[in-house]
Protein backbone atom coordinates (compact mmCIF):
# COMPACT_ATOMS: atom_id res chain seq x y z
CA UNK A 1 0.00 0.00 0.00
CA UNK A 2 1.00 3.63 -0.33
CA UNK A 3 0.56 3.90 3.42
CA UNK A 4 -1.93 5.02 6.02
CA UNK A 5 -3.76 8.25 5.37
CA UNK A 6 -6.54 10.36 6.80
CA UNK A 7 -8.89 11.63 4.10
CA UNK A 8 -11.20 14.52 5.00
CA UNK A 9 -14.06 15.46 2.69
CA UNK A 10 -15.39 18.93 2.06
CA UNK A 11 -18.44 19.79 4.18
CA UNK A 12 -20.91 19.80 1.29
CA UNK A 13 -20.09 16.28 0.04
CA UNK A 14 -23.09 13.93 0.28
CA UNK A 15 -23.16 10.80 2.44
CA UNK A 16 -23.70 8.76 -0.74
CA UNK A 17 -20.58 10.15 -2.36
CA UNK A 18 -18.55 9.45 0.79
CA UNK A 19 -19.85 5.86 0.93
CA UNK A 20 -19.05 5.41 -2.77
CA UNK A 21 -15.51 6.72 -2.24
CA UNK A 22 -14.92 4.35 0.70
CA UNK A 23 -16.23 1.43 -1.37
CA UNK A 24 -13.73 2.33 -4.10
CA UNK A 25 -10.86 2.26 -1.60
CA UNK A 26 -11.83 -1.27 -0.57
CA UNK A 27 -12.42 -2.39 -4.18
CA UNK A 28 -8.91 -1.20 -5.08
CA UNK A 29 -7.37 -3.25 -2.28
CA UNK A 30 -7.18 -0.67 0.49
CA UNK A 31 -8.75 -0.76 3.94
CA UNK A 32 -10.82 1.63 6.04
CA UNK A 33 -9.68 1.60 9.67
CA UNK A 34 -11.64 4.51 11.10
CA UNK A 35 -14.52 6.74 10.07
CA UNK A 36 -15.21 10.33 11.05
CA UNK A 37 -18.70 11.75 10.86
CA UNK A 38 -18.86 14.87 12.99
CA UNK A 39 -20.08 18.36 12.16
CA UNK A 40 -17.25 19.97 10.22
CA UNK A 41 -15.30 16.72 9.82
CA UNK A 42 -16.39 13.93 7.50
CA UNK A 43 -13.85 11.43 6.37
CA UNK A 44 -11.96 8.26 7.09
CA UNK A 45 -8.59 6.83 7.96
CA UNK A 46 -7.23 3.82 6.18
CA UNK A 47 -4.56 2.20 4.09
CA UNK A 48 -4.62 3.46 0.54
CA UNK A 49 -3.16 1.85 -2.54
CA UNK A 50 -0.93 4.12 -4.66
CA UNK A 51 -3.79 4.14 -7.22
CA UNK A 52 -6.32 5.45 -4.67
CA UNK A 53 -3.86 8.00 -3.31
CA UNK A 54 -3.17 9.44 -6.77
CA UNK A 55 -6.90 9.61 -7.52
CA UNK A 56 -7.66 11.39 -4.23
CA UNK A 57 -4.85 13.88 -4.76
CA UNK A 58 -6.55 14.74 -8.06
CA UNK A 59 -9.87 15.31 -6.24
CA UNK A 60 -8.37 17.64 -3.65
CA UNK A 61 -10.12 21.00 -3.63
CA UNK A 62 -13.15 19.48 -5.34
CA UNK A 63 -14.43 16.56 -3.25
CA UNK A 64 -11.64 16.23 -0.74
CA UNK A 65 -10.51 18.87 1.71
CA UNK A 66 -7.29 17.22 2.87
CA UNK A 67 -5.22 14.05 2.73
CA UNK A 68 -2.71 13.59 5.50
CA UNK A 69 -0.33 10.79 6.25
CA UNK A 70 -1.50 8.99 9.36
CA UNK A 71 1.85 8.59 11.05
CA UNK A 72 2.82 8.27 14.65
CA UNK A 73 4.42 11.53 15.63
CA UNK A 74 7.51 11.12 17.77
CA UNK A 75 9.41 13.91 19.45
CA UNK A 76 13.06 13.64 20.32
UniProtKB/Swiss-Prot annotation:
Tree of life domain: Eukaryota
Positions where N-acetylserine occurs in the chain: 1
One term of GO molecular function: serine-type endopeptidase inhibitor activity
Protein keywords: Acetylation, Protease inhibitor, Serine protease inhibitor
GO biological process, one term: vacuole fusion, non-autophagic
Family: Belongs to the protease inhibitor I9 family.
Role, per record: Specifically inhibits an endogenous intracellular serine proteinase (proteinase A).
Protein's UniProt name: Serine proteinase inhibitor IA-1
Lineage summary: Eukaryota, Fungi, Dikarya, Basidiomycota, Agaricomycotina
Amino acid sequence: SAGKFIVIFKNDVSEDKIRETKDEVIAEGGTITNEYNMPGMKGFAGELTPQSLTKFQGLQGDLIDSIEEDGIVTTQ
